[in-house]
Amino acid sequence: MTFNNKLVDKILEAIFPLPEEFGVILQDDEEIEPVDFSYVQEAVVDADPDADVYFGMSKLVICSPHLGGVVIKIPFNGFYYVDEETGELIWNDFTWATGSDNSDYCLTEFEKYKRLRTYGLDCFVAKTFFYKVKSGVRVFIQEEVSSMNDLYQTRKPSQKSSDLVKKWREEGKVHMDSEWVANCLDKYGKSKVERFLYYCANIDPDILEDVHGGNFGYRKDETPCILDYSNYSD
């Protein structure tokens, strides 16, 4: 995968080192200020004025039209929660990621990608690669994908594929967005989709644990794929 590695390095140089406790608040509470990531946003924009910073529960994602069709993913190493008795913010390290390092969901995602490649099923997920270690933190690069939540409209699948997905859903074989699965059928064929569904059900059943509208979508060439498959769970 080719991308603008000079800009990646410039952005990383701007935001590192990161705080030792790098994560978000697990619970929503109107009286608790959210974790302030403005310093990261400001540093990223200083490096690239067109860049944006997004974050979920397990990772920070940096996007820019100048990165060359990729995003930068940086893992959080834990989270804050609100002590019910004192109301204080308490830090807790991640310990339940399912990869070889149970504190790093980006590494989990990368290892899942490598495993899917060995099964010839990597077309269903965004390409993910380890980039480097920066100040003791692993940094990953992933191909840029538009999530279902960000798309105004998506390609309408064929009626044949839609009917088959409806049948599979009635049989309990499909638990994802029906239109997305039907588009997978149109793009990848019935045999490969059946293999992927079997893989998800029997080989890596937690891969779809956290798949929602923000975690799966379409590449620029309109092929469907999952863009966050690290299996975050609280």
Where are these predicted regions, by residue range?
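Juxta-kinase regulatory segment immediately upstream of eukaryotic protein kinase catalytic domains
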Residues: 2-50
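Active-site Asp-x-Gly
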Residues: 83-88, 171-172, 229-234
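Conserved structural core of kinase catalytic domains
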Residues: 114-191
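Short, solvent-exposed loop/turn segments at secondary-structure junctions
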Residues: 67-68, 77-80, 133-135, 145-148, ...
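ATP-binding glycine-rich loop module of kinase domains
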Residues: 52, 57-120
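Catalytic activation segment of kinase domains across protein kinase-like and atypical kinase folds
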Residues: 199-201, 205-234
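Charge-rich, solvent-exposed alpha-helical interaction surfaces
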Residues: 7-14, 43, 164-168, 180-184, ...
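Short hydrophobic-acidic sequence motifs that mark active-site Asp/Glu residues
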Residues: 68-73, 125, 141, 226
